[in-house]
Amino acid sequence: MSFDNYLVPTVIEQSGRGERAFDIYSRLLKERIVFLVGPVTDESANLVVAQLLFLESENPDKDIFFYINSPGGSVTAGMSIYDTMNFIKPDVSTLCLGQAASMGAFLLSAGEKGKRFALPNSRIMIHQPLISGGLGGQASDIEIHARELLKIKEKLNRLMAKHCGRDLADLERDTDRDNFMSAEEAKEYGLIDQVLENRASLQL
């Protein structure tokens, strides 16, 4: 997650030892909040994974809050986040603000059951994995890549079906093309557990 092109606010904390300045995201990390903003890339995934592992080392028994506003991106990068979410001991609660599309929606659905949320005007989109960039080369190589893509598609559909409590056939049908959902529709589908109007509506 890079904010190099934006002015990142700084928070000043005072203690008996004086003042200390944090950028806003480091301060929120102290509250166990992790952000995925923008495309899922190797770089953004590495940052998320590092923060998840750090928060586990700080307190393995306290929930982590994973906020997602992402159009999706790399499957392999996203799976590194997914595997880490399952590997660490703390529950990972997911929350969509803005949008969670493609791999973003997959990660949203992978939060701890009962702790997956979206804000009311969020947009969620699921679809089948795409080949990024131009695929060229020999016909046999293209065939190998096509078989691999089909295996990835089957794996993602199977995992998302488990998280949504749906049959694999439902996911195969519903991800065949871009499938956009409102927050309420995502709840009905099983991608999230609750739409949050405000903090007071949070039910755990």
UniProtKB/Swiss-Prot annotation:
Keywords: Cytoplasm, Hydrolase, Protease, Serine protease. One of its GO terms (molecular function) is ATP-dependent peptidase activity. It comes from the Bacteria. The keyword Translocase does not apply. Its main location: cytoplasm. It is an enzyme of class 3 (hydrolase). GO terms for cellular component: cytoplasm; endopeptidase Clp complex. One of its GO terms (biological process) is protein quality control for misfolded or incompletely synthesized proteins. The active site is at S102, H127. It is found in: Cytoplasm. It catalyses: Hydrolysis of proteins to small peptides in the presence of ATP and magnesium. alpha-casein is the usual test substrate. In the absence of ATP, only oligopeptides shorter than five residues are hydrolyzed (such as succinyl-Leu-Tyr-|-NHMec, and Leu-Tyr-Leu-|-Tyr-Trp, in which cleavage of the -Tyr-|-Leu- and -Tyr-|-Trp bonds also occurs). Its EC number is 3.4.21.92. Belongs to the peptidase S14 family. NCBIfam families: clpP (TIGR00493), PRK00277.1 (NF001368), PRK12553.1 (NF009205). Cleaves peptides in various proteins in a process that requires ATP hydrolysis. Has a chymotrypsin-like activity. Plays a major role in the degradation of misfolded proteins. Fourteen ClpP subunits assemble into 2 heptameric rings which stack back to back to give a disk-like structure with a central cavity, resembling the structure of eukaryotic proteasomes. This is ATP-dependent Clp protease proteolytic subunit. It comes from Neisseria meningitidis serogroup A / serotype 4A (strain DSM 15465 / Z2491). The lineage of its organism: Bacteria, Pseudomonadati, Pseudomonadota, Betaproteobacteria, Neisseriales.
